[in-house]
Amino acid sequence: MSENKFLPICKDDMIERGWEQCDFVLVTADAYIDHHSFGTAIISRVLENAGYKVGIIAQPDWKSVDDFKKLGRPRLGFLVNGGNMDPMVNHYTVSKKLRKKDLYTPKGEMGKRPDRATIVYCNKIREAYKDVNIVIGGIEASLRRFAHYDYWDNKVRKSILVDSGADLLVYGMSEKQIVEVADFLNQGFDGKYIRHIPGTCYIADSLDEIYEEHIVLPSFKEVSSDKRTYAECFKIQYDEQDPVRGRTLVQEHNGKYVVINKPEMPLSREELDRVYALPYQKTYHPIYEKDGGIAAIEEVKFSIVSSRGCSGNCSFCAITFHQGRIVTSRSEDSIVEEAEEITKYDDFKGYIHDIGGPTANFRKPACKKQLTLGACKHKRCMSPGICKNMEVDHREYLHLLRRVRKLPGIKKVFIRSGLRYDYIMADKDDTFFKELVEHHVSGQLKVAPEHVSPNVLKYMGKPAGKTYDEFRRKFFRITERLGKKQFIIPYLMSSHPGCKLEDAIMLAEYLRDINYQPEQVQDFYPTPGTLSTTMFYTGLDPLTMEEVYIPRSKEEKAMQRALLQFKNPKNYNIVYDALVKVGREDLIGNGPKCLIRDKNSFGKGNNHSNHKSGGRKSRNENSGRRESEDKKRSSHSKKQRGNKSRGFDQKSQRSSKGKKRR
C-alpha cells in the first residue's frame, strides 16, 4: 500500500503532495491508524473531504517541542485528542496499577503517551506556537468537559478546556461541528470566539457574553467542596444531555465561565453513509510494519460499524455523554459495500467478525418521538423495563445480516459487539433469535447481565435477572434443536455502587446453580462522565439524592471479586471470611448448596468446593444443561432477595457504558 494514500506525517509527505503548509495538524496519543473505528481517522478524513489539508502527528515525544514542530505551524490550527481511550484508563487498571501493554502503540509498548495526554500536548503546542488556535476533542475531552471527579487523583478536576488552555472543545462524534469550526477559522475567526455551534464548549469572561438560553451550574469551587452539590450538578448535566430539548450549560471556574453548548444532532443515515465511505486505508500507517504493526487494528479489521448511540443507558457507561441516547445507523447498502471490500483483503479468511455498534441490535431511535421531542427527560427507554413506546423490531438488522452472509467469499458473519438480550426477548417474532443462534455465534455468545441482585441491577440501570434467565434458557433450547455446542459468556461486575457483600453472595449462589465460574471478573471502574462514577464519589444517587452504599475498601472489593470465583482454591480463605462476615456459614460445608467446604475438610486431599471447577463447563454456560441449572435458589436466598427488594423500592433507576458492555 502506498504511503501517500495516508495523510502526511512528515515534511516529505507534504512536499510529495505539493503542500507548503497544512491547514490543520492533528495530534493524537494513539499510533496513526486510518480506519473509521478511530476518531483521528474520521475527523481527518472528514476535514479532507471538506477541502482542508490535514497532517497527523501521532504519539509525539512530549518531553520537547521538536515533534510538535515537525509539520510546521498549521494555517488554521491544531486539533488534539488523547486517543481512542482515556489515557488514564489506557495506562492504569482499576486498582491503579500500570498496565503491561498499550494496544494502540507499536509493540504494545507502554510509555509512548503521557498521562492526561490532551493537557500535556496542548501545553507543548503553546510552547511551540504561542497564539495558534487549538481545538480539543475525542473521548478524553468529551467526558471531561465539565468539572469532574477524577478517580486517579481522587478529587474533582476542572473542565479539561480550562486545564488544557485550548481555545475550543468539540464533544461527541464531532463530524458536523468540526467542519463548521474549520469553516469559521478559514473565514478568519479566532477559535475562542466561535461560540454558537452545538456540540462545542468555549470560555467566556462574563455571563453577559452568553446569548443563548442557558442554565448556570454550581461552580467548580462549589462542586469540588461539597459532594451533594456535585451530585445535584451532575443531575442537571444528565437531564440536558439531549440534542433536541437540551439547553446550554454554564459553569464558573475561578472567575471564567465554561460554556457547554447543547449537543449536536446525530448524523442522519445519509450523512453516516458518506462518513464511512471516505477513503480510509483501513489499516495502520506503513511506518509501523517494522515493529509488527498495531495490535488495535486486529479487533476491527474485519468488523463493520453499523450504528451509533445507545438506548440502553446503563449507569456505568459513558455512551450517553458521548454518542447520546438516540440511535442512528448506516444503510444496508453502505454496510454491504464495505463487506464486499473486506472480502478483497489478502488476509481475509471468510469471517466477518462483527456488524454492530455500541449495541449491535439497535438500528433506529427507540421511538418516533425522539427525533422531534428528544429522549425522555425523567425516564429511560429500557430500565426498569422496556418502555411501552419502544419500537422493538429486528427485521432490518436481520435482512442486513442475511445480505452480508450471502456475499461471495463470506463463510460466516459473527456478532461480537454488545447485544441487548432484553430487547431480543421483547421481540414477539423469534426469527432473529433463531438465526442469531444458527448463523452468528462463534461458539460463544457474549452478553452482559452484570449481576442478579435486584438492588444492584437497579443502580446499574440493567434489566431484571429473570430476563437473563429466560434468555439463556431459550438460547440453549434453540442451540440444542440445531444440534450445536454453543455457550454463553456472561460479563459480570463486582463492587458496583449499591453492591453489598450480601448481593455478591447472591450472585455467587446464582453462579453455583448454573454451574458457571467466570474466568475474569471486572471490578467497577469509575471513569469520567458516568452516573455510576458520580454515585461512587458522592455516595448519593443523583437521580433521587438518596444515599447509596459504596464498597470502597480493598478488603471488601477483594471479597466481592473472590465470591464470583469461589471455586478457585486460591480464593478459599477470602471467600470463607466473606461468608462468615455476613453470617452466611450455611454456605460453608458439605451440602449441595454450600459454596465451599469447611476448614476441617479443606487442605486434606478434598476439593475445597463441592462444585467442580475444571473443564469447559465451569467457564461457559453449557448448552447441554437441563433442569439442574434452573432450580430455585435456597429458601435463605429467596428471603435475602425479598428483604433487599423491599429495602430499596423507593430508589429510582439509573442510567448508562461502556465500552460495549450491554
Swiss-Prot record:
PROSITE patterns per record: RADICAL_SAM (PS51918)
Record-annotated residues binding [4Fe-4S] cluster?
Answer: C310, C314, C317
| Residue spans of biased composition, Basic residues class | 633-644
Q: Could you confirm whether the keyword Iron-sulfur appears in this record?
A: yes
What does the entry comment about cofactor binding? Binds 1 [4Fe-4S] cluster. The cluster is coordinated with 3 cysteines and an exchangeable S-adenosyl-L-methionine.
Give positions of region: Disordered: 596-662
Q: Name one Pfam family in it.
A: Radical_SAM_N
Alphabetically sorted, this entry's keywords are: 4Fe-4S, Iron, Iron-sulfur, Metal-binding, S-adenosyl-L-methionine
Per its UniProt record, the required cofactor names are: [4Fe-4S] cluster
> Where is composition skewed (Basic and acidic residues) in this entry?
618-632
Annotated Radical SAM core domain ranges read: 296-567
Q: Which HAMAP family match?
A: UPF0313
In terms of NCBIfam families, this protein maps to: SAM_YgiQ
User: Which family does the record assign?
Assistant: Belongs to the UPF0313 family.
List the protein's name.
UPF0313 protein CPF_1407
